[in-house]
A protein has these predicted regions:
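Mature catalytic core of soluble alpha/beta enzymes
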Residues: 2-7, 11, 18-265
Length: 265
């Protein structure tokens, strides 16, 4: 199976994040060529986190962005640095693990060198979740470019998400349901919105693959790998690795792994 070495377009999930309490705090902006939003539903003010969130997202960008000449990954790819930070090495090892488990459908390298585009947003989400929890918040909803991680609830009930219809995202979501309060991360990958982000071969019999995982890093990488594997091999790989996955095929039919019922009964 040809490796995937570039990040896939991640379908925007339909977020139904309303709240009857004005305490809901939303810190949002732009990063990585897309948007981010961090919603916190707590009775204490978390205004002090706004700059910390932005700083952490920027810090991660200067480790993994191939578009910044001075980033760690750019310096390594250009031969200007031979040293790897622990953070870089850890993400490389995670990428290699997914590559092995997926039979090579995921790779942290392309012809230009190392590239963590297909795992970097998920990693950034996990880092922001760490920051939020370290500051005492346990009810939050983090989203970067259509990938999410949430925990707890908003003031008037569970956080809710929906998976867009790949063919016509303006219609109601393909599915929508409550996010488990104990916390979950979700990433969706596919080709129809940004086909240039798909590298390598594969059956191309899927419109989208959505993965739910405790780690946004793993959800991001697995969504990429399973999309490339295609419906049959992707489902087989999801089952063998105990993954919760929702597939939408090119005929707009859906298939799900057995563990998806733990996310949406």
């Amino acid at each position: 199976m040809t490796s995937v070495v570039r990040g896939l377009s991640l379908f925007c999930l339909t977020f139904l994040v309303s709240c009857s309490n004005s305490i809901l705090q939303d810190f949002s902006g732009e990063i990585y060529g897309t948007t981010y939003s961090v919603k916190i539903a707590e009775n204490s003010s978390y205004a002090h986190l706004e700059s910390k969130i932005k700083n952490e997202l920027t810090r991660v960008d200067y480790v993994f962005s191939t578009y910044k000449p001075s980033s760690e990954i750019s310096l390594i790819n250009n031969g200007d640095s031979l040293e790897w930070s622990d953070e870089f090495r850890n993400l490389y090892e995670t990428s290699q693990k997914i590559s092995t488990l997926s039979g090579g459908a995921f790779s942290p390298k392309n012809d230009n060198g190392y590239d963590f585009s297909a795992i970097g947003k998920g990693y950034a989400i996990d880092k922001i979740a760490e920051l939020v929890e370290q500051n005492g918040a346990n009810n939050y909803f983090i989203e970067i470019g259509g990938e999410i991680r949430s925990k707890g609830a908003k003031f008037n009930g569970n956080w809710i998400f929906g998976i867009d219809r790949p063919i016509n995202s303006k219609k109601s979501p393909y599915i929508a349901f409550n996010i488990p309060r104990e916390g979950i991360s979700i990433a969706t990958s596919g080709e129809y919105r940004e086909p240039n982000h798909i590298w390598g071969g594969g059956p191309r019999d899927l419109l989208s693959v959505t993965v739910a995982h405790e780690s946004a890093t793993y959800a991001d990488a697995w969504a990429t790998a399973l999309y490339v594997l295609g419906k049959d091999q992707g489902l087989k790989t999801a089952e063998s690795n105990g993954l919760a996955v929702f597939f939408i095929s090119s005929s707009s039919d859906s298939t799900q792994s057995s563990n998806w019922s733990m996310i949406s009964p």
